[in-house]
Amino acid sequence: MSDPFQPTRGVTTLDRPASGTAYLNQSSVDWQETGTTGFETKPLYQSASGEMTMLMKIAPGAVSEAHAHDTVEEIYVLEGSFFDDENSYEAGDLIIRAPGAVHTAGSKSGALVLLKFSPA
């Protein structure tokens, strides 16, 4: 099962610093189409080991097909409301999904979420 939310073009993100602090002004990163109507991502961080952090904007009424990720998925709802097969979530809610968990995703009124993917 493929991941429908991968960016459709190259990812320019922040690198993890060897020491000190790294900084990325997210306004310098463009929103990218994902190949799933109504879902756009803004990649922020990606490591060689497979860790990735991104913002995802979900348009009102958008719903994904069933899919799974081969990583742990953490979702923090920043704005609006978000739903999957199990629950509905509001701003401030945190969702953690196991690798391989098949699910859909969507929003009735629109949402902005922070996604973090980590190797299992």
Model-identified regions with their sequence ranges:
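Residue-level marker of beta-strand positions
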Residues: V63, D93-L94, L112
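A short, N-terminal "cap"/entry segment at the start of jelly-roll beta-barrel domains
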Residues: M1-G50
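Short acidic-glycine-tyrosine-enriched beta hairpin
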Residues: D84-T104
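Glycine- and acidic-residue-biased ligand/ion/polar-headgroup-sensing regions
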Residues: A59-P60, H69-D84
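Acidic/His-leaning functional-site neighborhoods
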Residues: P43-Q46, G50-K57, G61-A68
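Ligand-binding loop in jelly-roll beta-barrel domains
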Residues: F39, P99-A120
